[in-house]
Amino acid sequence: MSVADFYGSNVEVLLNNDSKARGVITNFDSSNSILQLRLANDSTKSIVTKDIKDLRILPKNEIMPKNGTKSPSTNSTKLKSAETYSSKNKWSMDCDEEFDFAANLEKFDKKQVFAEFREKDKKDPAKLLVSHNKSPNRNYHHKQNVLGPSVKDEFVDLPSAGSQINGIDAVLSSSSNGHVTPGSKKGSRETLKKKPFVDENIPAELHTTTGDILKPITPEQLSQGIALAIAKTSTDIVVENAAQLLSQFVFSVLGGHKRLSSRNHNSQPLVCILVGSHDHASAAVAAGRRLCAIGIKVVLRLLTPFNVDNRQLLMFQAAGGYIPTENFDQFLNKLTSPIELVVDVLTGFHPSIDKNSHALIQWANDLNVLILSVDIPSGYTVQKKNTAILPKWTLALGAVTTTLAQAALVKQAAGVSVFVGNLGTGSQTWAELGILESQVTGQYLAQISCTSTN
């Protein structure tokens, strides 16, 4: 039995200051511990439970007085009339015993309630993303150990925060010697335009340049993994982790410390970030803020501002970032340096575009500058051929989706380097969803190549 069972009951509340209030219980706010009464004059009174000294349930046939609250200064005439009125209504026959919550709680049948929940739940347990519903792997890859370690380490040694950016530089610098050949930007575009967007088989495994094996996951699984990480930590932590990874990748692409050193007399690089409406929109703005803090000029081109945390936009502008409100091309003409890099964050890991996104994709391709796509090149779909953005690099935040893995098979020969970054949300988050094999371990960033296994 809960407080809700007493809604509509007439009660008399004795407060700590010896004042009384009579009324009908209309609501109880359990989070703030506030009891709400409707007094005789149809007004409402809210009482904090810590101020209640005693509470008495009145008979239903008892008539409440017009004044719901009586103060200690009530005159003797009113007290006498109240006593006379109470005797006429047989108040003396009321029960003064305390309510036994423990005894009434035992009347609550928990088993019956949970049985009703199970009857109403029509979901198929086999479709739930729970680790015990996942079929274990029967066959092992030739590079995998058949016998696992006998003792599982509770802590994993990870690189220090100071070595993170050096690790990204090392991965980028070795990309030309790995499975992917960067080539020239112009050559990449010509080859990409000749490649049709055919329905290739989704690769079962992803092989990194260091020999590790990852497995692609669906966009829905990636979305659930990020949502679970936010539930365990906070939105700000997940956003800042993604922003740090993206900003350090851009920093390395632009040349790192040598490009931004005071000894370099070239103008500051200008980066344009195309931001759409998706889960990583706020992370893209936060990455732009971090780039502004180290001397890189950043301009945002927002598809819509409604999916971005307003705090991130304010902090971005406070750091020196640009959010043009006028014609974008006219704004660029006022700047002293041209755009050096376009960061494509239009669609996130859901490959869908609208008319506005299509126009921005055409605009970015016509700039003939370096392009970095986040999660997946915008405009790519597995259903039909669409005009897609033509990046030199693609950075997957968290894990590689099956859509990106399929796109990489088509575009990899054209010189598109695909990377996957660890969001730092912890392996337990992904293990709960049964997709731990999608995570990069031992490093913050890894370059991948897709090979289908049959």
Swiss-Prot record:
CDD domains: LSm16_N. InterPro entries: DFDF, FDF_dom, Lsm16_N, Sm, YjeF_N_dom, YjeF_N_dom_sf. GO terms for cellular component: cytoplasm; cytoplasmic stress granule; P-body. Residues 173-192 are annotated as: Disordered. It holds the Pfam family YjeF_N. Residues 87-123 form the DFDF domain. GO terms for molecular function: molecular condensate scaffold activity; mRNA binding. One of its GO terms (biological process) is deadenylation-independent decapping of nuclear-transcribed mRNA. Keywords: Cytoplasm. It is found in: Cytoplasm, P-body. Residues 1-61 form the Sm domain. Residues 222-431 form the YjeF N-terminal domain. Belongs to the EDC3 family. Homodimer. Interacts with dcp2. Stimulates decapping of both stable and unstable mRNA during mRNA decay. Stimulates decapping presumably by preventing the DCP1-DCP2 decapping complex from adopting an inactive conformation. Together with pdc1, acts as a scaffolding protein sufficient for the phase transition of the components of the 5' to 3' mRNA degradation machinery to form P-bodies. Intermolecular interactions between the edc3 Sm domain and at least 10 helical leucine-rich motifs in dcp2 and pdc1 build the core of the interaction network of this spontaneous clustering process. This is Enhancer of mRNA-decapping protein 3.
